[in-house]
Amino acid sequence: MQFTVELDTSGLLCPIPIIKAKRALAAMAGGQVLRVVSTDPGAARDMLALTAKTGDTLLEQTSENKKFIFYLRKA
């Protein structure tokens, strides 16, 4: 999937990945896509909570090599 901005939060635990994702999305224009890479197992739950609060969209989530990858579209 194509993305505009990438944020690698590998090695960081809650709440840091979600705070960084929220800040990154706030700086983006509507329709742009943020790719977030995380090693925090709770990140999936956190990304869903973030998009529910902000109105942004979780387009896709995958995992590979113990990393969780999320694609979020800015509302």
Say what each PLM segment does:
Residues F3-S10:
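Short amphipathic
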Residues L48-A75:
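C-terminal structural segments of small proteins and small subunits
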Residues L12-T57:
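Amphipathic, hydrophobic secondary-structure cores in small proteins
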Residues M1-Q2, A75:
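Absolute protein N-terminus
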